[in-house]
């Protein structure tokens, strides 16, 4: 089973996680929303799969390029 790391495209804080561990997702689905410079930026899945785990919690500060979730295909 292949795993896919989902990385944040911007630094900021995790405003809301919109999916759950174990949930099946499609490419283009929003996994979470990052607040950066008073803007809400969605983290979008580039591949379909199942959410294995989140590497961050809501309200956590994150950096650009940080792994925020792991998917399995």
Question: Where in the sequence are the language-model features?
Answer:
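Short beta-strand-turn/beta-hairpin segments enriched in glycine/proline and small hydrophobics
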Residues: 1-13, 30-46, 73
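Short histidine-centered loop motifs in beta-beta connectors
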Residues: 16-20, 24, 53-56
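A structural signal for short beta-strand/turn segments enriched in small hydrophobics and glycine
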Residues: 22-31, 59-68
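Juxtamembrane helix-loop transition sites at the ends of transmembrane segments
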Residues: 45, 56-59
């Amino acid at each position: 089973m292949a795993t896919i790391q989902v990385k944040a495209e911007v630094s900021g804080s995790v405003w809301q996680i919109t999916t759950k561990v174990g949930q099946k997702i499609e490419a283009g689905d929003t996994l979470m929303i990052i607040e950066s410079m008073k803007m809400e930026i969605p983290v979008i899945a580039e591949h379909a799969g199942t959410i294995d785990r989140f590497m961050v919690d809501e309200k956590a500060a994150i950096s650009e390029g940080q792994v925020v979730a792991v998917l399995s295909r």
